[in-house]
């Protein structure tokens, strides 16, 4: 995991030099959003999601950045609430720290995009975090845009005697600036 974060930091550091003479702009971009994930699989826990990502927009179609989120979980269906608390010492939250890459399909006010977040969910029994998604960006001005995406989110949960994934179908909305 340390190697992955180091690779992202090196990539962010090197991109300005790579594009310096190509005429493509590099600028700061921030994103903030929230949403809900609906649990699927054997560990079907719904969750509320808050996240923020900050990084660089490279040309009109590529964004790379680092982000953090807060995922608050709740039980669903026949999953007893105590089964999750047993592995999290009563807590229901994971705090994923991740690298984000977004590719915009078009250089227009309204554009589809593909995005992927890969990182680690910080918690006593945290683990790998991944969240690929597809979405649509609606430009609201020269810099501000509304983003709506749909994807899948998985948070690995590890404990001394078990390891399981907490998967969910996620719907998010947010602003990029």
List each model region and its residues:
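Helix-adjacent hinge/juxtasegments
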Residues: 75-116
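Residues that define the transmembrane beta-barrel architecture of outer-membrane proteins
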Residues: 26-28, 44-48, 91-97, 110, ...
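Outer-membrane beta-barrel domain signature
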Residues: 21, 38-43, 84-90, 120-125, ...
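Bacterial Sec-dependent N-terminal signal peptides
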Residues: 1-26, 173, 177
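Transmembrane beta-strand segments of Gram-negative outer membrane beta-barrel proteins
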Residues: 21-38
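Repeated loop/turn-to-beta-strand initiation elements of outer-membrane beta-barrel proteins
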Residues: 61-64, 108-112, 138-146
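Transmembrane beta-strands of outer-membrane beta-barrel pores
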Residues: 34-40, 70-74, 103-107, 118-124, ...
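Outer-membrane beta-barrel "beta-signal"
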Residues: 101, 165-177
């Amino acid at each position: 995991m340390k190697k992955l974060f180091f690779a992202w930091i090196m990539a962010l550091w090197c991109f300005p030099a790579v594009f310096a003479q190509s005429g493509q702009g590099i600028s700061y971009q921030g994103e903030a959003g929230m949403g809900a994930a609906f649990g699927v699989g054997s560990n079907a826990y719904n969750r509320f999601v808050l996240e923020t990502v900050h990084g660089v927009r490279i040309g009109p179609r590529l964004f790379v950045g680092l982000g953090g989120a807060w995922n608050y979980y709740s039980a669903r269906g026949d999953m007893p609430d105590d089964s999750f608390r047993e592995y999290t010492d009563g807590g229901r939250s994971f705090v994923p720290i991740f690298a984000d890459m977004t590719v915009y399909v078009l250089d227009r006010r309204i554009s589809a995009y593909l995005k992927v977040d890969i990182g680690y969910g910080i918690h006593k029994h945290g683990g790998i975090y991944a969240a690929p998604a597809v979405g649509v960006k609606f430009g609201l001005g020269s810099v501000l845009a509304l983003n709506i995406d749909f994807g899948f989110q998985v948070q690995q949960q590890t404990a001394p005697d078990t390891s399981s994934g907490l998967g969910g179908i996620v719907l998010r909305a947010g602003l990029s600036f």
